Amino acid sequence: MLYKPSFAWYIYSYSANECIFASSLACACIQFRSAEIFSVRRDTEGSEILIYFNCDYTEGCHPNILKRLCETNMMQTVGYGEDEICDLARAKIRKACGREDVDVHFLVGGTQTNATVIAAILRPHQGALSADTGHINVHETGAVEATGHKVLPLPSTPDGKITAEQVENAYLAHVNDASFEHMVQPKLVYISLPTENGGLYSKAELTALHDVCTRCGLYLFIDGARLGYGLTAPENDVALADLCALSDVFYIGGTKVGALFGEAVVITNPALKTDFRYHIKQRGGMLAKGRLLGIQFDELFTDDLYFKISEKAVRQAKRIAKACEDAGCAFFAPSPTNQQFPIFPDTALEKLAEKYKYSYWARVDETHSAVRLCTSWATTDENVDALCKDIASVMAE
């Protein structure tokens, strides 16, 4: 077996981030003491559990966010994202985008955000074009379909992208069919940046998609659950301002990029702004204690924290990619982001699985499989050092 989940008891003894509260009539003072955090984590057989490289949401949140949440814990604000902290966060996101005219809304998670945005845009007879590997097509339990809208998959490139030519061909195939009114009408194009396979759309590719969507009367929606890791990849030539200019709506992912939870939807097309908060509420995305989302994005967009922690994760992933390459591994798909997809002999994976969690990705042949090794804002040098060393070791055997 290549990937064996382990059931574990987790026993944590904390001597860090101790919150010492001294309250007064005016404020609460919080002091954080930094010390070593000890974790004893054992599986059912008593051995230490694994180091996680399977995804980018295994940790909590960046310490700046945790500190700010504690500092503001007893603050009283209005609810549902209409507080002053959410307003500050929106202002910082608008500044980062270089656009004061965009609407910014905070939701809780990625699947909820995708379903809410797509359902808000489409009429009942319309569907969303997506890569066949797209998150809405394969990893959202039919969430978009549950809103009454069909996902229309297109074959993707090895790194998970679709092209402007594919979109135009799908549109023309529909309008030129004599029975077009008997089929779901493509009206929205869904892509993610980065893609599920770690691919990046270049500015030229996004421009081509934007242009074909404009010609065909389609909306372009960009899923940015891992946007920070895409924007900070050295190979990237796209900025937030470009996303504003080339898409109708996109979102800035927080859950996978330093936040406890949260996604920031940026609506650039004025036609899509009306009544969007109704849709958020209807889909269960309007958090009563909305300031918790505002606090997180306010911190992430203070002093470029969002981009700094993303860039660090990409650097760590590059180290892992080099270790795999040096050990003789091929790759399932090229990825310049925090997700890497090396191909290992199954025997090597069995050895790595004794110490590390990874995501099984695809069977390559009878004796080789592709896996995903994923870094995050919280990935440590020590864990990357250990993984790189062990990759070299198992591949040398």
Predicted regions and their residues:
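Cysteine-centered motifs
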Residues: 19, 27-29
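Active-site phosphate-binding strand-loop segment of PLP-dependent enzymes
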Residues: 53, 162-224
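PLP-dependent aminotransferase-like
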Residues: 122-185
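Active-site C-terminal subdomain of aminotransferase-like
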Residues: 185, 192, 200, 233, ...
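Conserved N-terminal alpha-helix of the aminotransferase class I/II PLP-enzyme fold
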Residues: 62-110, 132-133, 137, 143
